[in-house]
Structure formats: structure tokens, C-alpha cells
């Protein structure tokens, strides 16, 4: 269970809990693949590192333009 940062604090960084989950998971996979972490924390767990990076605003996302059916 995540205690810090709280889910409420993390939700201020994204538009939905699904986006948060996808963002953290993708970043954690990048860390496992060898990307350098952007925060200096004591944890070696990729999900914890990715969560902290999102919380600090170091990892962001961009929604693609929506194309409707014409």
C-alpha cells in the first residue's frame, strides 16, 4: 500500500487513476530496462522510484489528439 505520496496528492498530477497507473508502470519498466532514475531516494524498487518521479513532476504525459468518427 502506498502511504507517501498519498493517492490524493498523486491524483493532482494526472487526470485519472488509470493514467496514473499506466504512467507509473511505463516509467518503472524503463527503470528496469536501465534508465537512470531522476530522484535521489533510498529505495531501489522501480515502482517506488517512478511514483516519486511522478509526484515531483519529473515525469509527465501528453494525451494524443482525439479523432472522432465522421
Curated annotation (Swiss-Prot):
UniProt entry keywords in alphabetical sequence: DNA-directed RNA polymerase, Nucleotidyltransferase, Transcription, Transferase
Enzymatic reactions: RNA(n) + a ribonucleoside 5'-triphosphate = RNA(n+1) + diphosphate
Keyword Repeat: no
Superkingdom classification of source: Bacteria
One function term, GO molecular function aspect: DNA binding
UniProt-listed InterPro entries: DNA-dir_RNA_pol_omega, Pol_omega/Rpo6/RPB6, RPB6/omega-like_sf
EC number of the protein: 2.7.7.6
GO biological process: DNA-templated transcription
Record Gene3D superfamilies: 3.90.940.10
One GO CC term on file: DNA-directed RNA polymerase complex
Purpose: Promotes RNA polymerase assembly. Latches the N- and C-terminal regions of the beta' subunit thereby facilitating its interaction with the beta and alpha subunits.
The family this protein is said to belong to: Belongs to the RNA polymerase subunit omega family.
Annotated protein name in UniProt: DNA-directed RNA polymerase subunit omega
Species of origin: Caldanaerobacter subterraneus subsp. tengcongensis (strain DSM 15242 / JCM 11007 / NBRC 100824 / MB4)
